[in-house]
């Protein structure tokens, strides 16, 4: 059996597969937790302590009681932050700003991109799943959630295509 290495569009996920993969996390949201810095790891006490120690400036916003509540809620689940989730479903595994830097066809019109476009604001990314909706891992004490773009026009600052990772052929903007 010969080893076949896919290149170009064949190596990318199709836009509809990215959306299917993203929706899996929504359907199984009880198994997942937002945890800053997590990229798909089981949230044990040791792993959570490591992630907290790795980003002390981020975690300063929470009191020790709030951190305990976050850890209690997250314990045993698979952890993702916003970019970890987008990286898992698209294959672009990096932080939110770098995901945005890799996007093409950027626009401030949040309705201009096709389904599977990236929605962005500084420090956060999510996935447009079409029909005016998006999915993301928003913040601590949350899992994968769905939202309406129309209710978040002041939240997001742009949309773009993750062209090197997603094949948008055949995708429409609704």
Kindly label every feature range from the protein language model.
Residues 1-83, 91-92, 137, 163-174:
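N-terminal capping segments
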Residues 7-8, 44, 102, 147-152:
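Compositionally biased, intrinsically disordered low-complexity segments
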Residues 84-101, 130:
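Short, basic/aromatic beta-hairpin or loop at an interaction surface
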Residues 102-110:
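Short alpha-helix capping/helix-loop boundary micro-motifs
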Residues 114-117:
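Loop/turn positions that initiate beta-strands
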Residues 121-124:
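Short, surface-exposed coil-to-beta transition loops
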Residues 127-154:
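Catalytic Cys-His active-site segments of thiol-dependent hydrolases/isopeptidases
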Residues 155-165:
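Short coil-to-beta transitions that initiate beta-strands within beta-rich domains
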